[in-house]
């Protein structure tokens, strides 16, 4: 497999991002591309709380950091705080990634590193989302 880290997201397109970056990273997560996620862990009827927010671009710009790791952490935190406010425990996050087409795969992967680290710190995972 060739190195794709310097490609821009706009060069790959949504399907290319799913196949090249997201599916290999989240092993078998089918939720990318249909804006939803299947949570196999939910076996019995129960109250389920769902939320999804993207990280506001102006807020990310205020971080003034070229590394998107912290923006990824913030993106996960925004969604986890919505669940906490509802008194819910997270089973997984359905995350919206709103990024310019000029973002490189390497930058996107750093954002994903931040999302994953925040999820791990709170005992959850990325279940799917939208690009």
Specify the residue positions occupied by each region the protein language model found.
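Extreme N-terminal cap/leader segments of soluble proteins
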Residues: 1-67, 95, 110, 114-123
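A glycine-rich phosphate/pyrophosphate-binding beta-strand-loop-alpha-helix module
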Residues: 68-131
């Amino acid at each position: 497999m060739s190195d794709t880290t310097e490609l821009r997201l706009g060069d790959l397109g949504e399907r290319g991002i799913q196949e090249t970056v997201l599916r290999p990273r989240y092993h078998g997560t089918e939720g990318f591309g249909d804006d939803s996620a299947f949570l196999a862990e939910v076996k019995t009827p129960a109250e389920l709380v769902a939320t999804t927010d993207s990280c506001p671009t102006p807020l990310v710009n205020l971080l003034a950091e070229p590394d998107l790791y912290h923006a990824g952490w913030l993106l996960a935190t925004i969604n986890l705080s919505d669940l906490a406010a509802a008194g819910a425990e997270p089973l997984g996050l359905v995350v919206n990634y709103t990024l310019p087409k000029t973002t490189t795969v390497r930058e996107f992967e750093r954002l994903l590193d931040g999302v994953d680290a925040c999820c791990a710190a709170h005992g959850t995972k990325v279940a799917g989302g939208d690009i």
